Structures are given as structure tokens and as C-alpha cells.
């Protein structure tokens, strides 16, 4: 089993590029699995990240870097992006880095608002979608199920995310503080129909806002509101919707920000949750208009305590080690099976001698049962030790012992070298390249 992943997120690129990469990734996992290029694949696509997890087949024609390059190039072509740009933009992980990264992500430690819980459900839905489409290999299922357990443990054992914070919830809290009236009386206009827009709709309703309109530059507002409620806004009706809105929320990451000149006069709060910006920053200079950006959200969000973050990272590191240890232990199955076959073959040969000399009698049956119990007992300790040594990275010692004592030839399982936890820059410190092409 060789697992890897490709990642593009808000930490390294703008939201518009993430969106284009996500579009380019549509169908890539299914295609790679159907062609036999991958044994399994799961795509995690959210409003601010694209992650493609893959498993190489047992006898792959390319190594991990080669497979990653092929996938990145295919995504680039489908997205209409420069291949070299995509290769340089997407982070690549393999071996023990994969569970460590996924467990960190699912716990909210990689999120723009540390500790947010939306990502946990998104990871769960990514697995369900892959299982439904038939691209989720057993090893990838084990990885994502372990990620879900890790997220639950982080939530139960630390204070991380206990307030149920998210980018959307923090932004709406800020908007509530600076907008006149209460949510039941406010009129909201949402730009976008993606995951962020869906989360925004749910958060607005939780706060009692019922008068919600939705605009989509791609024309998907009608379909979105049919499924989630609200009223669709067309290009023709957009000026009227802007005039009616008390709160305007952008989460589409459109190709070009709306200029300030399109905003009608009057007091309103504008919330821009798109990393690529839905609205020109000059909106903040308009009379009686308050602009809330992602940077505003990061500054305003109550910081998680160092203790909570440290405790969460400890859980993630332990879970990643446990996953790798269990994986390595399972890789010793071939050696265990070889030892059992050898031992049982010796037993069967001796039992044949007993039958030849004494025939099939009640005594012979009792002897066979006793000998098989004895063999199972003798094999117990070597079986346990095989998994222990594998978990300690000493599988080669066990294999050498089998060869020396029994003449059994078994391939040594691949044991990835331990890698140090990756250190990530704060999103605000990381340059975000923009797509070309």
C-alpha cells in the first residue's frame, strides 16, 4: 500500500485558483481508477481547498512523484491552467505525511479559523462520495475513518472548536455588531452557490434571518435556491437586490471583484469571504458602508488557547503514528502466513504418518486435535512478535529470522522512514500566487 495526496489550499493560492483546480479535478479520480493508474482515490473539495488522495496499485508503472505529476498535469489541462504553475502550486505528500496531513486538516488545525468544525463534515462527505462512485479503496477508507476518529477525539479531549466557530459564524457575529436592527428584520444578499454559500445560508437561518436572496454570476442561483431556499437573483434584478440588502455576503470567489460604483447609496454591511475578493476593497470608502474581510475575521476570531492547539496536535501526531504502526503491522501478514503454512505443513506430514500406522481411529482424532492446539499455541507468540517488530520498524529482523531458522523467503515490507511533523506558515504570511492561463 502506497498512499499519497496533492493539496492546494488557501494557505498557498487564492480562492479563485482553488476553485479552478477543483473544477479541473472533476472526474480525475474516477478516470484514474478506471484506467488502473490508481488503486483508489478520494477527492476533498471545499470552498478553500482541493485535496486528492490516491493509492498506487501494487505493481504500478510509475512511482509516487510520477503519479502525482500525471494527476497535476491532468487537473491543469482540464482547468485551463499552466501545468508548471499547478505543479509548483500543489503541495505533495506521501507515506507517513499523508495521515498526519489529513488528521491535521480534519481537526481544524489547517483552517483559516483554527478549530472550525465544517471541515469534519466535508471530509466525511468526501469519503461517502468516493464510496458511492467506487473509487475508495479499502486502505483509503481506513485512512478516512481514522481521520474521523481523530477529529472526534480532538473535539472530545480538547477545548479546540468547542464554541463551534467557523469563518462564516465569526463573520456574521461581526456583521451583527455593526448592522442596525436584528437578523429577523434584516434583508441578506448572498453571492455564490458553493459550499461557503450553503454554510452562510444555514448560519443566517440559525440567526433568524428569513429574507435571503442569492446571486450567482454563473447562473446557478435558481438551482441553488430550489434546493436550499431563498430567492434567486438574476443579472437584471441584481441592482434592486443590492438596494434592498442590509447585509451583502460574498463567497463566490468570482473572476473579477464587483466595483464600488455598482453599490447603491445607503447604509449596509458588506462581508467578503472570498480569498480572491468578490468586492473591490474601495467599497469600504463608501459612505455608511462597513466592509468585513477574511482578515477582519482572522483578527476578530477569539484565539484558541495554546493549550488546546498543543493538545490537538499531540492527538494528531499520536493518531498518525498509530495509523502507520497498524499499517506496517498489517504488512507483516505475508510473513505470518508463510510461517503458519510451513508449520501446518509439518503438522500434516506427521499426522499422515500417524494415520498410516494406526488408521482412522478415535485415538488418532484426539491426537490430531491435541497437536493442532499445540501448534496454534506455539504460533501465538511469533505472530504477536511479528506485529510488534513491524510497529517498531524492525520487520527486516523478523524476516531474517524466518530465513535463517526455516529457510522461508519472504519479501521485506516497505517501512517508510519517520518524518518530522511539517511546519506550516500562517496563511497571512504565505504568498498566494494567482493562476495564469
UniProtKB/Swiss-Prot annotation:
Pfam families xrefs: GlutR_dimer, GlutR_N, Shikimate_DH
A single GO BP: protoporphyrinogen IX biosynthetic process from glutamate
Binding site for substrate: 46-49, 111, 116-118, 122
EC number(s) stated in the UniProt entry for this protein: 1.2.1.70
NCBIfam families: PRK00045.3-4
Record text about domains: Possesses an unusual extended V-shaped dimeric structure with each monomer consisting of three distinct domains arranged along a curved 'spinal' alpha-helix. The N-terminal catalytic domain specifically recognizes the glutamate moiety of the substrate. The second domain is the NADPH-binding domain, and the third C-terminal domain is responsible for dimerization.
Protein name per its UniProtKB record: Glutamyl-tRNA reductase
Organism: Kocuria rhizophila (strain ATCC 9341 / DSM 348 / NBRC 103217 / DC2201)
Name of the gene encoding the protein in the UniProt record: hemA
Amino acid at each position: 500500500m502506497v498512499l499519497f495526496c496533492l493539496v492546494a489550499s488557501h494557505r498557498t493560492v487564492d480562492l479563485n485558483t482553488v476553485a479552478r483546480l477543483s473544477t479541473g479535478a472533476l472526474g480525475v479520480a474516477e478516470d484514474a481508477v478506471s484506467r488502473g493508474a490508481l488503486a483508489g482515490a478520494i477527492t476533498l473539495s471545499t470552498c478553500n481547498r482541493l485535496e486528492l488522495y490516491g493509492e498506487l496499485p501494487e505493481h504500478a508503472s510509475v512511482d509516487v512523484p510520477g503519479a502525482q505529476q500525471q494527476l497535476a498535469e491532468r487537473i491543469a489541462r482540464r482547468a485551463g491552467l499552466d501545468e508548471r504553475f499547478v505543479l509548483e502550486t500543489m503541495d505533495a505528500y506521501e507515506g507517513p505525511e499523508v495521515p498526519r496531513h489529513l488528521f491535521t486538516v480534519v481537526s481544524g488545525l489547517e483552517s483559516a479559523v483554527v478549530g472550525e468544525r465544517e471541515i469534519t463534515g466535508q471530509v466525511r462527505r468526501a469519503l461517502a462520495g468516493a464510496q458511492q462512485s467506487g473509487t475508495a479503496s479499502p486502505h483509503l477508507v481506513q485512512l478516512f475513518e481514522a481521520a474521523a476518529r481523530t477529529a472526534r477525539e480532538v473535539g472530545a479531549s480538547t477545548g479546540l472548536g468547542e464554541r463551534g466557530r467557523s469563518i462564516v459564524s465569526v463573520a456574521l457575529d461581526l456583521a451583527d455588531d455593526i448592522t442596525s436592527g436584528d437578523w429577523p428584520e434584516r434583508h441578506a444578499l448572498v453571492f455564490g452557490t458553493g459550499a461557503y454559500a450553503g454554510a452562510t445560508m444555514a448560519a443566517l437561518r440559525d440567526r433568524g434571518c428569513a429574507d435571503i436572496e442569492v446571486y450567482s454570476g454563473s447562473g446557478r442561483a435558481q438551482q441553488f435556491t430550489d434546493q436550499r431556499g431563498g430567492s434567486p437573483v438574476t443579472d437584471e434584478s441584481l441592482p434592486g437586490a443590492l438596494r434592498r440588502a442590509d447585509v451583502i455576503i460574498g463567497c463566490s470567489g468570482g473572476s473579477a471583484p464587483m466595483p464600488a460604483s455598482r453599490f447603491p447609496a445607503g447604509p449596509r454591511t458588506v462581508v467578503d469571504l472570498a480569498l480572491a475578493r468578490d468586492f473591490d476593497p474601495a467599497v469600504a470608502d463608501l459612505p455608511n458602508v462597513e466592509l468585513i474581510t477574511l482578515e477582519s475575521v482572522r483578527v476578530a476570531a477569539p484565539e484558541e488557547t495554546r493549550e488546546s492547539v498543543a493538545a490537538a496536535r499531540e492527538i494528531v501526531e499520536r493518531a498518525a503514528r498509530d495509523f502507520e504502526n497498524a499499517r506496517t503491522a498489517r504488512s507483516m501478514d505475508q510473513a505470518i502466513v508463510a510461517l503458519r503454512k510451513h508449520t501446518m505443513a509439518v503438522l500434516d506430514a506427521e499426522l499422515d504418518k500417524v494415520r498410516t500406522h494406526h488408521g482412522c481411529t478415535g485415538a488418532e482424532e484426539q491426537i490430531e486435535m491435541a497437536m493442532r492446539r499445540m501448534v496454534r499455541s506455539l504460533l501465538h507468540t511469533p505472530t504477536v512478535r511479528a506485529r510488534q517488530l513491524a510497529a517498531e520498524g524492525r520487520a527486516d529482523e523478523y524476516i531474517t529470522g524466518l530465513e535463517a531458522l526455516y529457510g522461508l523467503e519472504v519479501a521485506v515490507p516497505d517501512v517508510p522512514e519517520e518524518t518530522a511533523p511539517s511546519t506550516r506558515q500562517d496563511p497571512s504570511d504565505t504568498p498566494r500566487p494567482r493562476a495564469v492561463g
